[in-house]
UniProtKB/Swiss-Prot annotation:
GO terms for biological process: DNA-templated transcription. Zn(2+) 1 binds at C67, C69, C82, C85. Zn(2+) 2 binds at C867, C943, C950, C953. Its EC number is 2.7.7.6. This is DNA-directed RNA polymerase subunit beta'. It catalyses: RNA(n) + a ribonucleoside 5'-triphosphate = RNA(n+1) + diphosphate. GO terms for cellular component: DNA-directed RNA polymerase complex.
Amino acid sequence: MIFSQGVSPFKGDFSKIKFSIASPESILAHSRGEVLKPETINYRTFKPERDGLMCEKIFGPTKDWECYCGKYKRVRYKGIICDRCGVEVTMKSVRRERMGHISLAVPVVHTWFFRSVPSKIGALLDLSTKELERVIYYEVYVVINPGEPGEKQGIKKLDRLTEEQYFQIITEYEDNQDLDDNDPAKFVAKMGGEAIHTLLKGLELDTQAVDLRKILRESGSEQKRADALKRLKVVEAFRKSFEPVKKTRKKSTGLFPEDEAPEPYVYEGNKPEYMVMEVIPVIPPELRPLVPLEGGRFATSDLNDLYRRVIIRNNRLKKLIDIRAPEVILRNEKRMLQEAVDALFDNSRKANAVKTGESNRPLKSLSDALKGKQGRFRQNLLGKRVDYSGRSVIVVGPELKLHECGLPKSMAIELFQPFVIRRLVERGIAKSVKSAKKLIDKKDPIVWDVLEKVIDGRPVLLNRAPTLHRLGIQAFQPVLIEGKAIQIHPLVCTAFNADFDGDQMAVHVPLSQEAQLEATLLMLSSHNLILPQSGKPVTVPSQDMVLGMYYLTKSRLGEKGQGKLFYGTEEVMIAFNEERIGLHALVFVHYDGRIEQKFDPLRMLDIIPDDQPEQKEWLKTKIGENKILVTTVGRVLFNRYVPEKIGFINKVIDKKGAKDLISKLSSEVGNVATAEFLDNIKQVGFHFAMKGGLSIGLADAIIPEVKVQHIKKATKESTKIVREYNRGTLTENERYNQIVDVWQKVTNLVAEESYQKLRKDRSGFNPLFMMLDSGARGSREQVRQLTGMRGLIARPQKSMSGQPGEIIENPIISNLKEGLTVLEYFVSTHGARKGLSDTSLKTADAGYLTRRLHDVAQDVIVTEDDCGTTRGIHVERGIEEETGGQIKFSEKIRGRVASRDIVDNLNDVVILPAGGIITDEIADAIQKNAGVVEADIRSVLTCEAKQGICSKCYGTNLSVHKLVEIGEAVGVIAAQSIGEPGTQLTLRTFHQGGTAQGGIAETETKSSMDGQVEFESIRSVEQETINEDGMPETVTLVIQKNGKINILDPDSGKFLKRYEVPHGAHLVCKNGDIVKKDDVLFSSEPNSTQIIAEVEGEVKFVDIDKGVTYKEEVDPQTGYVQHVIINWRTKLRASETREPRILIVDKEGETLKTYPVPIKSNLFIENGKKVKIGDMLAKVPRNLDRVGGDITAGLPKVTELFEARIPSDPAIVSEIDGYVGFGPQRRSSKEIKVKNEFGEEKNYYVQVGKHVLANEGDEVTAGEPLTDGAVSPQDILRIQGPNAVQQYLVNEIQKVYQINAGVEINDKHLEVIVRQMLQKVRVEEPGDTELLPGDLIDRTMFIRANSDVSEKVRVTSKGDAPARIHEGQLYKTREIIKLNRELRRNSKQLIDVEPALQATSHPVLLGITSAALQTESVISAASFQETTKVLTDAAVAGKIDNLAGLKENVIVGKLIPAGTGLKKYLKLSLDMLAEGKESADALAEEEAGAAESGEDDA
């Protein structure tokens, strides 16, 4: 046997990796020898045993340049193979790469291919896993060739036989056994791996594929087709793995004549029999080490035990075969060998896994070494430990510049030691490396000077775990400091999410020139001022700095020097330094720059003393010229640091003001000036926080006096409610809700009172109020608990449905200043603990969400400038009303490219032509301009780039406000931008200590602009009612669903805005009215849905029976008796059914209209009463979420949307436009029919008790919900198509983040992820392509497959075509035209063809987990989840990984194809290197030539 001499398969550059099943030949080609003995090392000499699992002869020496027996030592014998012990003299590192093998006595089935779902071997042989198992584990025989005996006995190929049946046939037909094995008449049956090997070897895959496709086309049985499809997938995978490989032609050596030369191609691929192994590879010994411990014991890798079991059993079996042992014993030994090999490859799949002796845990097999967080992929390939790094505790460094960090000397000397040593040797301070090291150890003073020089201009990277987004690693210029803690700048804490309570950070040194350059240019902290997730600044002052700036810029009447007039800002500073004027004094300053007035100067003239009339007159004239500034001394001081271009900032600076100012600075004056400004205001902020001496004393928390009265009143009210409940006039639910409402109102009242009290205290200079108002620390919520009352406490519960018991109804009346009673304290501990436990549990969930997002989007990279699409998405101004002003129209379009002209409808002006970028200025202008009501913008969702996305569809890079560059890894940025706030989402209840905040729902809808009202499909009726004051009034009631109010421009009649009007709303405006901004259009009741009579007639109740379907309850306020529908199913026998409904009948008793009444409805009408149009028949209450801000609903909701899960109680959605009708009622469901004018009808069955939104005869549109409940994204995709579902997902996720958590994430990040969820299509009809029905493939691959077929035709009749043309086959159109020309010329019959059929498909919405597993890259999918399954499928299909994404390249150790790792940049640097080398060579040649000529002259 010849072994390849250790040729590494990865020598040189490679661009793709192919996966396939290893053939016995390839295993032997990689092996250096056979392992024959189970021994590892000799326990006396501690040397490896020869031919054992650690053998030096096979795997290489254990000591560098030394053979086993010691005959050859030293490097000079390199490459010699010792004649005594057979060991090659080489480095010991080869023990990490050299492999061995074990030759098995009988073939063994590879467990991956037989236990995978579906079983690969089972699919090929058409056997179930159970039957396969019985054959493999030597329980039954399988017939390989029935021969004559089989025919006579009616036995077919692949039949299973028991031992008795087998021996019966063998004895009955003894002569038959003498025939040759290849004789078709001979009866052959075998068991175990051998049988499977023989069967797989005899398979004809091409024939099998044709037969299976025939079944798919022609079979009527659904089950048969499903089975055929499952098998065809495996067969096709094997067939696809065969691909032509160029054969290297040997130069003619006379071995065979030229005409006998072989074909230039051979077909290489997976043969099915490779799934049964005859040879097992043994991995290198250093990858399964054996380490000696103290006390003469050894720690060993589990793999050694598993290999040992295989070798022992294999050797025993060989012996037994040699001595001709009985069949029973052999069979048992063979079965044990099969089990040993199974355990070696995958020990976790088996029920009876092999366990260790002592701790009884399953041994870690080869599969386990790849799987999971501790597996090879995630532990060693995706994350590695790095040298040149250190970590330490962090402390604040307030005197540092923004781009600096303080590095302890002791750390710096360790990190930069090699560079220091080199300097010391170069400068001759030390003679050798050794002496330089000694100098360093002695801490010689000269070393620090050298270190200073070494680190100058060399950035270091700081990282704080967990690194949730890219700002978790930033570069800084190190400054050497004494001490042992790293100092960091206070402004970068936000980005790192760091504080100084013991956090640690890691330091890394970029070594290469390129790495240093990238760190300085791209990663320096002063270049990362903007958050990539929202485009908002991240280096925002906080806490002390904010408080200092707020204190500095606040004004106070009556300060020293108030009302003085100064000629310029310098004069003000002189006066202040001379202490002639107070910091908060209002003064008049002559100023020539840009003025943004905050005070009305003429009104402020009163603060000038009356004895200076001429000053007042002079001021009046100057104010007219807008040259006089009314400001405070502090603001003048603050504005010294604001760049001139920005103008004078004349307002109190709080946290939000600071944030907006920094945002403005970064876009207008650039990073350098902004960084300088930040450093200045840091100094100013800290200085004035100190000067102001702002700290909280107990006296600063002021409790309002009115609190006592409010509480007395509330206690009275709640006692009254309880009394009514005891009388039986209130239900439990109503009592609870009313008490909660009473206390909620009181808590809010007291909170507002205490806030106002603080605001007025010391004319706004109460330290507690200043901290709150400036945004430095604390929230209104906390102040309420300190000085108002703690109020109601939420009871921790998972559900968010608003059921009773979510809020503990006894409030905490005390506040934290007064102190809590024992009971109150006990009640509040509950919520506080929940906050902490939630935090720790949810952080893991958020981390897992981030990981899945990363995996699904890691290969989305900007690959081209413009994909050329004309499509885009449509954005309307209505988004603001829907989200309560949280999401602005301008935010939706900012930084995008317009796909159509953006037009001002009022003035007919094009504000921005198609293809233009919507910059910040344009976006703000559009926001203010009411004429722009809609915009079409380019989006990632509609990008048509072949791979990755294009920069026009993505828009601007948020962190630099420029169009995104090619090579930007936008997928990873998107994943980080969504995942990082995900961990904040979780910490939401944390600070409020679990107190409940209930919202009082908004009932009025106001116009957001001036305009004229136009009604669209609104049917209304006027109704007499009694208002709150007891006076009669007429209201206009909307009695039609889907009504709309449009706002038009009064002059041109152009459409500006649309509002949806709910059923039962009260109209405040009339059609054609002119309305102003903030005028009320209509009001609606948010807590309930009303059922309103739409026709006149008499009421008739059906199935509304007292005690069965309704009960009587008394309304506490009015004393009216209410009839409430109850769940009747609990009251009746199983066979009985009821459907409570209200009919309206005419005089003849004919039914005019039917209204089903859902459970919990209140009836507002009596049986037999006459009703007019617009009368209320019943009210259906809605559940309101009472508990505010607990994000437990937030994260699971986001996960549900990203995973595209079907909601637990989904709404039933109409699939067509049409009119609603009802079918007969069943026991547990009722039928809704939707019929359109073309006679198409769809039927839906609804569970009884579910509220049906549609009434008989209502018109509905496709996609409209017919019942209540959440709409399933899968339904939206099916009915309204991919665009609708993409928009739905983006908007819904955005709502959770913005409204529940107040976190801003730009839409484009969500779009990148949602695009990935819709990348796949499912093939419906494959046509003439090679696809299979039901295949899930990438959209681009589907388009490619169809375009391939579009150039081909199918031959229907071959005429006189040459023999190579077959009927029914596909050929290129050009080829057939050419052949037909030839045939026509020779007057022969032409070839008849028809166009090839294209495949059809429908888009599929995948959750992010499925999408990540379905990625084109094998390596990426394998490192994500289900490693063994992914690798098995890839090996069978011979898949090729093109290394297109980031993850694959990290794993194989290449530069990532993004940023500076893009191919075009790499090529650039290689070209430059080549040029540099050429010019250096030329120079050297010149010099050599010159030297030679010099010698000649001499």
